[in-house]
């Protein structure tokens, strides 16, 4: 696919449905981004990220958790974080009846896990999340054994594998050891 190829929401849904082994996103300029399936370790860490978040939120009833196949539409971009949280009350009442539509909002909290992706590309994606309304983002960098925390105020903090991250005021009370997703 040429790097200049732009797609509409309907085209992106159609392309995704015809290619279930691939994941697609759309950049803010409308260009299509194709991501191959992850390897075993990356898929495992994505599943763990969602499971840790879901397990904690199920007992606190603060909102909904979404996995890496969910498309979030913020401005013109459509992105699919490895795990995401949307606070209660922010989703449209009928959100769970709209299977063939992207969620038309930015999550409150996202988790991304670096696989073989260039770290600069993922860091730019994290900044884009924040620019589009995400309040807190965690980027786990397995290659360098660290994590980065992105906040709505634009600050970014780097943490070592030995640190424990917390959901701050976005997912209040949620904590996770960095090493658990490395």
Label each PLM-derived region with a short phrase:
Residues 1-182:
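Gly/Pro/Ser/Thr-rich low-complexity, intrinsically disordered segments predominantly at protein N-termini
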């Amino acid at each position: 696919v040429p790097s200049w190829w732009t797609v509409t929401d309907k085209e992106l849904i159609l392309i995704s449905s015809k290619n279930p082994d691939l994941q697609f996103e759309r950049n803010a300029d409308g260009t299509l981004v194709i991501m191959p399936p992850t390897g075993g370790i990356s898929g495992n860490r994505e599943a763990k990220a969602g499971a840790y978040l879901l397990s904690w939120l199920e007992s606190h009833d603060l909102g909904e958790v979404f996995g890496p196949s969910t498309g979030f539409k913020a401005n013109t971009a459509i992105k699919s974080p490895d795990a995401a949280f949307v606070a209660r009350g922010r989703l449209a009442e009928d959100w769970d009846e709209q299977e063939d539509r992207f969620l038309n909002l930015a999550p409150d909290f996202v988790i991304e896990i670096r696989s073989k992706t260039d770290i600069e590309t993922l860091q730019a994606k994290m900044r884009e999340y924040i620019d589009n309304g995400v309040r807190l983002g965690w980027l786990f960098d397995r290659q360098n054994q660290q994590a980065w925390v992105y906040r709505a105020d634009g600050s970014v903090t780097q943490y070592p594998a030995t640190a424990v991250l917390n959901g701050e005021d976005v997912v209040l009370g949620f904590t996770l050891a960095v090493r658990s997703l490395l």
